[in-house]
Each structure stands twice: as structure tokens, then as C-alpha cells.
């Protein structure tokens, strides 16, 4: 069942670009990015943006839980929307770092780099995957070593029933 209240991909991206409630400026930024992509020779910029954002989205994430005093990290599969939120957040963080250039040029450059499997956003994604790999390797259930004496006690307890 499709939820009709879900926002489209374009609206979610425009809302991410929006600052201080300025929807018109955010929409203008989005459409100038699309125009810039068409001038660079990309036939379908909507499809291009969607595909590159899919490349940026992580499939797995990490959840931190407290077990007593220790704080452990556990791997978790992310829903597509949640992964998309991570990708957009990383994109905005990268845009905030580079203040000297124009915002639109930075967005276009980052999308072009992501289409070639490079760029800051994909580095963030692979850093997250390193954490997931760490969580997978260190949080496996470990078997307790049964001491020699305990195994002998268990064996004698079993003999009583024969």
C-alpha cells in the first residue's frame, strides 16, 4: 500500500536546501542545479540526481545501546528514507565546509563526484560502513569456555540417570 502523504524526492531535497523557511530560494537553487547539469551534457538531470543520491545512501547503520556501564554499537538495516536523510545530511555538511565557492557549484560538483564513486559524501558512507563492520565483528555472541572441572561435574550428573 502506497502512502499518499509521502513527499516526493524533489520536495524532500528542496526542504533540505531550505534555510530559515525560504522555500522559494530553495526551489530556485534546485532548479538552477538542474539547469547546470543540463548544460554539462546530462540528458535527464532528474534521473541523474535520483541515481546519484541512491549511490550516496547507506544500506546499514549503527545503533548505540547501553548495556550496564558499557556503551556498545550494533549494526542495523536502514529504511530507504532514513538512508536518504543520512545522505542529504552529509551533503549539507560538506556544503557548509566549503564556504568560498558558490553553493550551486558545490552541489553540482558533489553530485558529479558521487556519480563517479568519489567525493566527501561517499567517504562518509564508507566511514559508516567501517563502523558497521566493527560492530559486526565485535558484537558476535561468544561461547563461554567450559572449564575441565565443570565438564567432569556435568558428566557425573548425567551418569546418575542411567
UniProtKB/Swiss-Prot annotation:
GO terms for molecular function: rRNA binding. Coiled coil: none annotated. InterPro entries: Ribosomal_uS7, Ribosomal_uS7_dom, Ribosomal_uS7_dom_sf. One of its GO terms (cellular component) is ribonucleoprotein complex. Keywords: Mitochondrion, Ribonucleoprotein, Ribosomal protein, RNA-binding, rRNA-binding. Part of the small ribosomal subunit. This is Small ribosomal subunit protein uS7m. It comes from Dictyostelium citrinum (Slime mold).
Amino acid at each position: 500500500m502506497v502512502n499518499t502523504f509521502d513527499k516526493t524526492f524533489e520536495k524532500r531535497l528542496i526542504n533540505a536546501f531550505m534555510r530559515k523557511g525560504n522555500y522559494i530560494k530553495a526551489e530556485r537553487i534546485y532548479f538552477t542545479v538542474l539547469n547546470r547539469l543540463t548544460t554539462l551534457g546530462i540528458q535527464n538531470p532528474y534521473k541523474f540526481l535520483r541515481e546519484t543520491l541512491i549511490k550516496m545512501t547507506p544500506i546499514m547503520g549503527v545503533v548505540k545501546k547501553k548495556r550496564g556501564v558499557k556503551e556498545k554499537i550494533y549494526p542495523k538495516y536502514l529504511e530507504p528514507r532514513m538512508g536518504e536523510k543520512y545522505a542529504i545530511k552529509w551533503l549539507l555538511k560538506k556544503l557548509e565546509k566549503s564556504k568560498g565557492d558558490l553553493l550551486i557549484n558545490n552541489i553540482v560538483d558533489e553530485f558529479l563526484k558521487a556519480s563517479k564513486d568519489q567525493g566527501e559524501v561517499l567517504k562518509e558512507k564508507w566511514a559508516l560502513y567501517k563502523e558497521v563492520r566493527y560492530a559486526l565483528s565485535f558484537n558476535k555472541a561468544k561461547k563461554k569456555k567450559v572449564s575441565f572441572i565443570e565438564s567432569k561435574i556435568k558428566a557425573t550428573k548425567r551418569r546418575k540417570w542411567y
